[in-house]
């Protein structure tokens, strides 16, 4: 008999959340949705409530929650509507929930992800900011509360699959020489450097291989996404910066690789579809159907690899710099990047100002020691304030 997993999906209306529900719908005998959460996407979460009938639906925005409550009653659903950060933490730590998909984008996802880990849940981690901003604190919470952590980012999931199942945090003990973290290079990999000043949000969001949300698409275009993933890999796999090498692989077929001391390189391949890593984590240690098309190696035909261009992608350099600095530096990097990307998407500054803002904010704030989650959030707040001041000066 299959044990039913009871799920809270944090960020159910985003691309990861939607893909998660697609996989869940294929296995009604395996999964029961207890709670869904979103920022303020009333119509999307209403449609999801109609289909999955969760016990709770949480919106961060109060006015949106009031609108959803009206629609839920009109639809005759028993779903209870909640709002606010405290409610996100509540549904992430419900006693009868065993699995939490942490898919809220950005720093907003940190507190509910911590709540899930603190109550010993099986945490499916798609919110990379939790690891970037508070990696040491979060991993300590996971260990102290015997939570299970399964990575959802395609690259980290690929690394997880390429490591021995008995891996417990010591790469050298299992014979690993290094992690090869693949990157597509985004839509501007071959664009003349002089042309980057004038690229539009629409161009930056047009990823050549993946279908993603706007923020992560811009991060891919700047390669900040890969920089954040380097920091995440450092904490997930206890890898030193020297053990993590970024490899540009334009086809996005190899999702990452692990090189062993005997010269063997193990890789995870597949079509670029987030349902694959999501299903791997949902079903782990079993394999479950995803709806993803089989990989046609004859159609792929070739696989290319390049070294990253740090002149073209200064955000990648800044991420390595933040990792080396430690302390509050990764949180400052992340916060400044969130403000910069949001400003670019609103056409308030050019694409090339994204790394410029981040670097200036990192220099302005400097590095501070981090001991608690409150320290992390304080650094986040200072960085956002400095980024807004930078933006005001730009105008």
Swiss-Prot record:
GO terms for biological process: isopentenyl diphosphate biosynthetic process, methylerythritol 4-phosphate pathway involved in terpenoid biosynthetic process. It is an enzyme of class 1 (oxidoreductase). GO terms for molecular function: 1-deoxy-D-xylulose-5-phosphate reductoisomerase activity; manganese ion binding; NADPH binding. 1-deoxy-D-xylulose 5-phosphate binds at residues 128, 154-155, 184, 207, 220, 225-226, 229. Its EC number is 1.1.1.267. NADPH binds at residues 13-16, 40, 127, 129, 213. Pathway: Isoprenoid biosynthesis; isopentenyl diphosphate biosynthesis via DXP pathway; isopentenyl diphosphate from 1-deoxy-D-xylulose 5-phosphate: step 1/6. It comes from the Bacteria. Keywords: Isoprene biosynthesis, Manganese, Metal-binding, NADP, Oxidoreductase. NCBIfam families: Dxr, PRK05447.1-1, PRK12464.1. HAMAP family: DXP_reductoisom. PANTHER family: 1-DEOXY-D-XYLULOSE 5-PHOSPHATE REDUCTOISOMERASE (PTHR30525), 1-DEOXY-D-XYLULOSE 5-PHOSPHATE REDUCTOISOMERASE, CHLOROPLASTIC (PTHR30525:SF0). This is 1-deoxy-D-xylulose 5-phosphate reductoisomerase. It comes from Nitrosospira multiformis (strain ATCC 25196 / NCIMB 11849 / C 71).
